[in-house]
Structures are given as C-alpha cells and as structure tokens.
C-alpha cells in the first residue's frame, strides 16, 4: 500500500515538472508581453536624437534683419566723425527708413522714423511748389535715392561704400540721390529743341563728387566719390554747315 502511494506521488511531481510554460521561449528577465510604454519611449528618444543631429547639420537660416544688424554692427561709427565732416552734400542722406522720392535741400539729415519722413516730404512740397509754364527740358532725366556698395574716389581708385552705419546704437542706411538720363535721344534728332539741320546732339549722364562714408578694413572715413548727378545735352556742329 505504501509502495503504491510513493509511486503516485512521484508520477504527480514528474507531471508538474514536465508541463509546458508559455514563458519558456522568452529571454531571461524579459516579460512575456512587450511593454508598449517602453517601446514608445525608445522610439521618441531616437526621433529626438535624429532631429538634433539634423539641426546641427542644417542650422536654421538667420533672418534678413539679423544679418543686416550683424553686418552693420561690425563697424561702429564714432559720432565725432560726423563733426569732422566737410563739404556736405544734399545728395547724401543717412536714414533708418527709405527716403522720399523728392530730395530735400538740407545739407545732411538723419531720419529715424516715418513721421520724420512725412515732415521731410511736406517741407519739400511747401518750399518747392510745382509750376508748369509750358517749359520743356532739352533732355529727360530721372532721379532716385539709391544705395551704393562700391564707387570710384577722386583719385580714380575703387572704394567700398558703407551701406549700413551703426551710430549711437541705431542702424542707418547711407543713400545717394542720383540723376541720370532716361534716353540719349528724347526726340529722333537727338536733344529736344536743337536745330538738327546744323547740329548733332545727344543726351548723356554726367557725374560729380560728393563726400561719402567709406570703409577700408575696419576703419570708416570720409572720401569723395563719383555719382550720377545730371543729364546734359552734347552738341557738335555738322560738317559742311558754316
């Protein structure tokens, strides 16, 4: 009887040990079911790392305003430099805003905001009313404020013109009022009002010198540069007409 009991107990234990387990094929220390939260965290970390590496290889482009301020901040102009300026020209203007189309007759002016520009325009209209008495120009010209990066100085050498001027923590732009011919031949015969039977004529742009703020290396200085300032008529007598 006791022998039968021992046999049954041994058979029962062998059956328990031999029973298959659902986790037998899972590596040691790993759960039978994957943890979705851990997988999501791993994927998120990988995405952030990839994005960070991409940002380092392709940095975000700087805004145009930041680039403009950075280039102007390279050279800070001493206000005393303007006190030493001589031979001021109404064709040179330092402004934080685009200047009006009409040229003011003052020697030099610093315009810092839109109100100053409006006052400049009103002053121009009041001081210079438009009169039309049937007068015509020999040549047609156009005048406009422009920025210049390079020019020719009074010695005939090329110079670098300062476009942005950092003065008292304000960034000003240097503008030049240029005048040039619209057309070398406003009429088929050349200049308007010239007797084409006796004269050859054509319109051409002429230049003059103005004092401008230029730079050489990291130094700013005043130099005379050449700009377009007028449109004139050039005539020559036709051969055989005396």
Swiss-Prot record:
Residues 52-66 have a biased composition (Basic and acidic residues). Expressed by the venom gland. Keywords: Cleavage on pair of basic residues, Disulfide bond, Glycoprotein, Growth factor, Lipid-binding, Metalloenzyme inhibitor, Metalloprotease inhibitor, Protease inhibitor, Secreted, Signal, Toxin. GO terms for molecular function: growth factor activity; lipid binding; metalloendopeptidase inhibitor activity; nerve growth factor receptor binding; toxin activity. GO terms for cellular component: axon; dendrite; extracellular space; synaptic vesicle. Residues 1-18 form the signal peptide. Residues 19-125 form a propeptide. InterPro entries: Cystine-knot_cytokine, Nerve_growth_factor-like, Nerve_growth_factor-rel, Nerve_growth_factor_bsu, Nerve_growth_factor_CS, Venom_nerve_growth_factor. The keyword Secreted applies. Homodimer; non-covalently linked. This is Venom nerve growth factor 2. It comes from Demansia vestigiata (Lesser black whip snake).
């Amino acid at each position: 009887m006791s022998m039968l009991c021992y046999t049954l107990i041994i058979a029962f234990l062998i059956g328990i040990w031999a029973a298959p387990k659902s986790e037998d094929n899972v590596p040691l220390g790993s759960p039978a079911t994957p943890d979705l939260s851990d997988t999501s965290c791993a994927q998120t970390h990988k995405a952030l790392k990839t994005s960070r590496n991409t940002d380092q290889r392709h940095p975000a482009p700087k805004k145009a305003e930041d680039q403009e301020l950075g280039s102007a901040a390279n050279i800070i102009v001493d206000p005393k430099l303007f006190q030493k300026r001589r031979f001021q020209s109404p064709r040179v203007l330092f402004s934080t805003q685009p200047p009006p189309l009409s040229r003011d007759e003052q020697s030099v002016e610093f315009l810092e905001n839109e109100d100053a520009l409006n006052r400049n325009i009103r002053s121009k209209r009041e001081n210079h009313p438009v009169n039309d008495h049937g007068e015509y120009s020999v040549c047609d010209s156009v005048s406009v404020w422009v920025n210049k990066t390079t020019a020719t100085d009074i010695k005939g050498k090329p110079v670098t013109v300062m476009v942005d001027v950092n003065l008292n923590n304000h960034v000003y732009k240097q503008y030049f009022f240029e005048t040039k011919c619209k057309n070398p031949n406003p009429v088929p015969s050349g200049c308007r009002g010239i007797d084409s039977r006796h004269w050859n004529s054509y319109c051409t742009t002429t230049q003059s010198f103005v004092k401008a703020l230029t730079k050489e290396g990291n130094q700013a200085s005043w130099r005379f540069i050449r700009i377009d300032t007028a449109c004139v008529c050039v005539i020559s007598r036709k051969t055989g007409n005396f």
